[in-house]
């Protein structure tokens, strides 16, 4: 049985009595305003979650079936979040959904900087019927964000802010100083006694402080309005010396002309963030847990950090706090959109945007952590130029209604990078601010990069409905990318969907308790370019050493990639069928979706012979993977009165992933990869030297499964000691810990089932809301317990209190 991960959030607040729960409201709006062929999900964050929100991604968490938001790193505010829409669809390709903010192509990092108070709504596109319109960028789903604009109600101003504190909820229960000494003496082991009783978690942690402020004002009339907002956040994390600051500025203006036939939308968005971190946070906590507790918290009388030379895997935690890993990111984008009603049913739209980003990173590792020290500086810049033009037509005659859109767009990107690394620090006082004062430049430590990919697209869609009851929609998008090979420059991504509004049929028209009943199905294809760069298809070279030619040092070059003229994007085909049901005036609403998707032409890197090839690796489109599942959403309004209202919303998703194949043909050559490949291993003392892999990629299994030796317990040896009794699973008389040896599949690392629920209750102006998120059907490997209960590393390394038992 899998582990259960449960998140419970309870918030109290005061708000206007006119607000109703967003999910019920949005489901009603969705069913009333969109075609029965669609399965879009709209989320309005100002109503869904109330109380403090750290960033826009907090709004998405638990709100939509099949959409999982997780945090990478120790600091959930400063580190990048991960979003998966209906699971993992690729090994080497991108798995992040495409993010569109006010029509501007963006990414999750930028989305995480937007203040929730600036967001009008989210729209989540999951099925290929919808994502096919984004072609080669839509295979992992699409998240469209619409930010707030001017209301035209005259001048308005708003402010919201909050202060908060944070601390570690739970510490590892490690041996203290006296317990450490007593255990070592009881076991007859030699140990170092520094004479202290230090809790090294207290050395590296503190009570964190966060405060954020958001100011917005808007004004104007219905024909000409604006909205501007400013946001600031300062977060001192629970790790000493770590902090994160973010400043956001946003401006939007809308202008109408020619009696509203021409509408112009102009927007500017910019943010600047600074992160002060250390070089390796994982090593910091590992060192704090494993350090000898009898050592001092600071330096000795000579100013040196006390360390057991036998404990080579760790450093003094206090010394690690002097590491630096500082980042500064600036982002600016602006857009202009125009819509002109040529005729009452014919609209010409044009949109253009420009985005600029700059990221600087500086790292410093002092000589008391690394013998020669280490300094790194890097600067990365990016520019995006985007434009599209579309023509939309709609018309109704008799019982028929037709909507049609044709368009074209072009995206040009420029990416540059420059970085340098050095060792041999003259003095730690320079930190990373004087690389010239270092004595050693590692080969390959200084380099630069450049790429300028482009994407040109044409698209069209048609939706026809009869009697506002039967609907059919078809779409086709063609993409031409500079990153794929000449043989596959263009790719085409079609979709078709059907919808039936059953409630409007005669046999249900008199059924009063059913308010809505709609059925839909669809099929579509989308692409994935995430695993390809501007140089992936080329036989590229790279410097591989320095030799002396005629007495002059000369850099030699060598191949690092084979040419593949047939390389192209991955293709994901999806079939879905679903329904929406509302009863008792939509007081109870059910929505469900069943889907199956298959990724083909999956990118993977294969071993190839040399000299047949110039390099021993070849990336090719051969593998395949499937995802299937069912999603369920339930919304209930058990109480709905003037002064009292209660809303209950629940969503659940079951998802099954399977790696189907990694073998196939390439130009008459059979290409194959190992059926079992390690993708995750243990790290730490006692876990090196091989046989420490725990997570695997196995053909025929979900991507990321635990494949482990089976321990039956303890067995006594001839000397009266005990050792682990490992089962010989293949009955060959030997215990083999290697990959594919005596191991069994112990479970998968990703959840099979995820749930999200929101319960809100309002009485007059008092509201209370509760959110519960959960994940089921997966396993969590307790590497922490394995590392800190291993008595073979004691007393050089610290262990947990229960380990000696």
Specify the residue positions occupied by each region the protein language model found.
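Extracytoplasmic gating/loop element in the C-terminal half of outer-membrane beta-barrel translocons
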Residues: 190, 481, 775-805
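Short, small/polar-rich motifs associated with maturation and membrane association
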Residues: 1-257, 262-271, 317, 331-333, ...
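Short aromatic-centered micro-motifs
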Residues: 99, 464, 729, 761
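Glycine-rich, aromatic-lined ligand/substrate-binding cores of catalytic
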Residues: 748-783
């Amino acid at each position: 049985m899998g582990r259960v991960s449960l998140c419970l959030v309870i918030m109290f607040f005061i708000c206007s009595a006119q607000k109703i729960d967003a999910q019920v409201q949005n489901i009603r709006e969705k069913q009333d305003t969109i075609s029965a062929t669609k399965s879009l999900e709209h989320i309005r964050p100002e109503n869904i979650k109330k109380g403090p929100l750290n960033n826009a991604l907090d709004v998405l968490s638990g709100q939509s079936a099949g959409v999982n938001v997780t945090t990478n790193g120790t600091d959930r505010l400063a580190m990048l979040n991960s979003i998966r829409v209906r699971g993992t669809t690729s090994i080497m390709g991108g798995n992040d959904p495409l993010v569109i903010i006010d029509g501007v192509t963006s990414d999750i990092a930028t989305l995480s900087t937007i203040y929730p108070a600036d967001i009008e709504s989210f729209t989540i596109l999951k099925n290929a019927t919808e994502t096919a319109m984004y072609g080669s960028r839509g295979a992992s789903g699409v998240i469209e964000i619409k930010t707030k604009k001017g209301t035209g109600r005259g001048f308005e101003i708003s402010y919201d802010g909050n202060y908060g504190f944070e601390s570690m909820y739970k510490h590892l229960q490690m041996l203290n100083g006296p317990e450490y000494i007593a255990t070592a003496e009881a076991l007859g082991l030699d140990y170092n006694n520094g004479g202290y009783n230090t809790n090294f978690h207290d050395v590296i942690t503190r009570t964190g402080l966060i405060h954020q402020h958001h100011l917005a004002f808007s004004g104007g009339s219905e024909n000409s309005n604006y909205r501007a907002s400013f946001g600031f956040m300062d977060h001192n994390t629970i790790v000493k010396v770590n902090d994160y600051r973010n400043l956001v500025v946003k401006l939007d203006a809308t202008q109408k002309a020619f009696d509203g036939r021409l509408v112009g939308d102009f927007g500017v968005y910019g943010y600047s963030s600074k992160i002060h971190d250390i070089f390796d946070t994982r090593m910091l906590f590992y060192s704090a847990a494993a350090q000898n507790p009898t050592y001092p918290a600071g330096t000795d009388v000579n100013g040196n950090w006390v360390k057991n030379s036998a404990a080579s895997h760790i450093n003094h935690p206090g010394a690690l706090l002097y590491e630096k890993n500082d980042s500064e990111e600036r982002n600016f984008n602006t857009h202009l959109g125009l819509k002109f009603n040529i005729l009452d049913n014919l609209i010409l739209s044009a949109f253009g945007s420009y985005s600029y980003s700059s990221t600087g990173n500086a790292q410093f590792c002092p000589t008391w952590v690394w013998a020669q020290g280490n300094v790194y500086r890097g600067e990365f810049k990016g520019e995006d130029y985007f434009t599209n033009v579309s023509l939309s037509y709609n018309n109704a005659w008799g019982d028929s209604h037709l909507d049609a859109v044709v368009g074209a767009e072009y995206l040009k990107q420029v990416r540059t990078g420059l970085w340098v690394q050095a060792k041999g620090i003259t003095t730690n006082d320079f930190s990373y601010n004087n690389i010239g004062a270092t004595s050693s430049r590692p080969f390959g430590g200084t380099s630069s990069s450049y790429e300028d990919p482009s994407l040109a697209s044409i698209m069209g869609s048609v939706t026809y409905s009869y009697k506002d009851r039967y609907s059919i929609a078809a779409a086709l998008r063609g993409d031409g990318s500079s990153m794929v090979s000449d043989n596959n420059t263009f790719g085409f991504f079609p979709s078709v969907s059907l919808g039936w509004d059953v409630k409007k049929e005669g046999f249900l028209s008199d059924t009063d308790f059913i308010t809505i009943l709609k059925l839909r199905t669809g099929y579509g294809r989308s692409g994935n370019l995430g695993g390809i760069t501007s140089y992936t298809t080329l036989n590229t070279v790279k410097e591989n050493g320095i030799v002396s030619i005629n007495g002059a040092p000369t850099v030699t070059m060598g191949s690092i990639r084979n040419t593949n003229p047939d390389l192209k994007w991955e293709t994901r085909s999806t079939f879905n069928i679903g329904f929406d049901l509302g009863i008792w005036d939509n007081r109870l609403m059910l929505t469900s979706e069943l889907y199956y998707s298959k990724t083909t032409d999956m990118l993977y890197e294969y071993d190839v012979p040399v000299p047949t090839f110039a390099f021993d690796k070849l990336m090719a489109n051969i593998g395949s993977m499937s995802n299937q599942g069912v999603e369920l959403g339930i919304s209930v309004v058990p109480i709905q009165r003037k002064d009292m209202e209660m809303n209950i919303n629940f969503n659940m998703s079951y998802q099954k992933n399977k790696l189907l194949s990694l073998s196939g043909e390439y130009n008459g050559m059979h290409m194959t990869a190992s059926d079992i490949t390690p993708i995750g291993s243990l790290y730490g003392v006692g876990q090196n030297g091989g046989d420490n892999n725990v997570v695997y990629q196995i053909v025929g299994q979900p991507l990321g499964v635990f494949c482990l030796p089976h321990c039956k317990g303890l067995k006594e040896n001839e000397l009266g000691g005990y050792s682990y009794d490992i089962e010989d699973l293949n009955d060959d008389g030997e215990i083999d810990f290697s990959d594919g040896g005596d191991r069994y599949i112990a479970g998968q690392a990703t959840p099979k089932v995820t749930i999200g629920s929101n319960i809100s209750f309002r009485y007059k102006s008092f509201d209370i809301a509760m959110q519960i998120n959960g994940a089921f059907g997966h396993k969590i490997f307790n590497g922490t317990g394995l590392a800190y209960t291993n008595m073979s590393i004691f007393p050089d390394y610290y262990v947990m209190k229960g380990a000696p038992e």
